Every structure is written in C-alpha cells, then in structure tokens.
Amino acid sequence: MSRPIVAIVGRPNVGKSTLVNRIAQTSDAIVHQSRGVTRDRSYHVADWNGREFMLVDTGGIEPMKSDDVFATSIRDQALAAAEEAAVILFVVDGSVGVTEEDESVARMVRKLKKPTFLLVNKLDNPARENDSLWEFYSLGVGEPVAVSALHGHGTGDLLDEVVALLPEDAGDADDEPDTLRVAIIGRPNAGKSSLFNKMIGNDRSIVSNIAGTTRDAIDTVVERNGKRYRMVDTAGIRKKSTVYENIEYYSMVRGLRAIDRADVALLVVDASTGVTEQDQKVANLAIERGCALVVLLNKWDLLKDDYEREAVMETVDRRLTMAPWAEYLRISAMTGRSVHKIWDMVDAAAERRASHITTSQLNRLLTDMREFGHTVSDGKRRLKMHYVTQTGDKPPAFTFFVNHTDLVTDNYKRYIENRMRATFDFKGTPIRLRFRAKKSDKDKE
C-alpha cells in the first residue's frame, strides 16, 4: 500500500517534533528546547480512523541569510518534503506571535499551492486561544487553527480534516494479486538505474508502463517465464523544476514509497565503497515494512583482490546485522555478471515471505524447545510458553501464548527466532514474533 505524505514544516523550535510524536503516537522524534535539533527529515507511519499516511518531520527552516551551516540543506529538504506531500502542516508558535522566519516559511508554502493547515501551537489555554490567532491571518496561508501538540488539544479535529483531503490509495497492492512487486532501492550512484535496465532487457516482454504514485516515477510490468513482476522504479532520480534539489532526499523518499508498495526489496550496494550508513537505514526501512530483502553487491568486478573483497564483506557483517537472514548476491549491473540469478532469488524470497506453517508443526518445535530446557526467569517466576500459532503472512507473523509477557527479553526473542529459522525456511524474509499472556490452570492457582 502506498501511503500519502503529510509534511510538517516551520521555523525552528515551534514544536514540530512534539506534534509528530502526538500524531504518530510515537516518541521517535527528538524533542529539545534548542533550535535545530531536527536536522534530517524523519518518517513515521500514522493512522487516523483507519486511514494510514506517512508523516514527514522536517528540520526548522531558517532564512537564507542564516549563519547556520546546515540551514541551506535543511531548507532544501523541507521544501522537498513539502513538494512530495499531499497535505502540508505549517506550524507556528502561538506564544511568540508572527516572526520574520514564519513569514519566510509562509512565502515558500504559498508558492507550492498545496492544501495547507496553519497550526498555531503552544496554545495550552483554550479559553484564550481566539485572542492569539488573529495576527497569524497575516501569513496568508488560510485560517489559523489552534493546537497544543504537548497536550493534544485540537489535534483530533485537525486530523479529521487532514485525512479528508488525502488522495484515495491507488490500490495497486491488491488489484494485481498475481503480480510480484519488486523495488530496487539504495543510495544514489550505486547502480540502480543500470541494474533496472539490465533486468528488463530485450529477453523480457515489457507489458506496460504504469504511472506510479510518486510523481514522475514509472513502474514497469515485466513478464518472465510466465510470471508477472511490477518493477517499482526508483532507479532514475529525475530533475525537479526547482533549484532546491536534494538528490539524497529524493532518493530516500522514493525508496520509502517504493518499499511501501513492494513484496521484495532489492538493496543495491556499491561494492567499491561497501555498506554505508544510508544503506543500513534503507535496509531497516524495508525490514520494518515487512519486505523480503535481497542484497545485491554491485560493481563487484571493480574490486581488485581478495583483500578488497574481504573488506567489503566486513562492512556487510558490521552494518547489516539486523538482517543476517537476507540473501546476498555479488553482481555487476554493467557487465551483467550474475544478474540473471536475481529473478530466482526474488521468487524464492517472495515465496518464503508468504509461508504458512501449520500449528502442529509450530507446537512440535515448541515441545522441542521445552525439552531442551532453555527458558528465562526473574528468580521468582519462570517463563512458560503454552502454544504458538501463525497469525499473519507477508511477512510471516507468529503469536506465542505465555504466562508472563514481561519475562520475554530481547535476547530470548532472538533465541526463538533463531530456532524457528533453523527449523523452517525463512531465508530472505523477516518474521514477526508476538507474545500474549495466557495463564494455565496451574498458574491461576
């Protein structure tokens, strides 16, 4: 499912990150009294009355004359976020009034001609809010709306109006049940475009070009050996009609949108530089959203000797510890080395992502684990796992019914996942483990 984007913009220290935490019901956004704490944009899945959208938190926008060395980059990224958005939330500080910085942001927002809500934050006294709103009409971006991000005042009515303006989902996730959606993701210049072109070369039948949900991205539907693949195109980063271009930002946004729509993510890594922090972030996004993951070490032919090859694999081991189960393939998109193997790896990863394990198979594993005797306790209580069942797929999700959920540590979760992966074939796909409390008759005594 492709989620529409809602961008939050404003000058520094008006409460944008607090509002993000309120709307997305998370504490991931860093909140601090100092200016400029949020320098990079961050992404959060939010839900209001069953309608999901992607909330983008941007850094504080400062005037072009600012002495802050990050100001230009932050401004560029905030504008890029606003350009990608279906709805803009422009946040100002009601306790301070209109500032020159607010007016600068307002000029930027007005030029975009997007649906915009002007949110006057930090109005924690509803009885006095009308007295504080009138001066914000001068910004020329519509009627000011009083909110308190800290206490939640006004946010419910706001979200009702926001979701009413969001475009309907394209529905491509469910309209093509026999088509496998594949996203080619990764940082700029890793070789995504070359790989994309090589994969859909002359020996394939290109059925159609379909406009994707991201502006000016094209999805290509390919038929190969009787199977259909929808290649979610993030390979080409097209130029925007604005001088505020930020290639890394657009790459990240398009990768994010592609991941939301994909069954399998192909993470293209430039082997000449190894796995970077941005590769790590993109891999994490794919895992969080439940994509099967295939890591393609591109430009392998440029590595000169075993020493360089070992150094690259060291970055893989160090940076991609969150996905030891991922499939890896050494390729050259330029020469075509091993590119033909990608299709079989995509098929296998997608099949495992859709795996169904019977309850009897799962509980046989649980019996083996009990007999092995590995469990956890807090000295007074001992964890007992009564039974387990599969409760979802794409990716596979399993619910364990236990006596005390608070005894389940992260280490024990990893132990269970490792045992499950050793027993069942989940190569290439994440799995989800959930734990619910269920006391046996003996526990109740």
Q: Where is each model-derived feature located?
A:
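A short amphipathic beta-strand at an alpha->beta junction
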Residues: 425-440
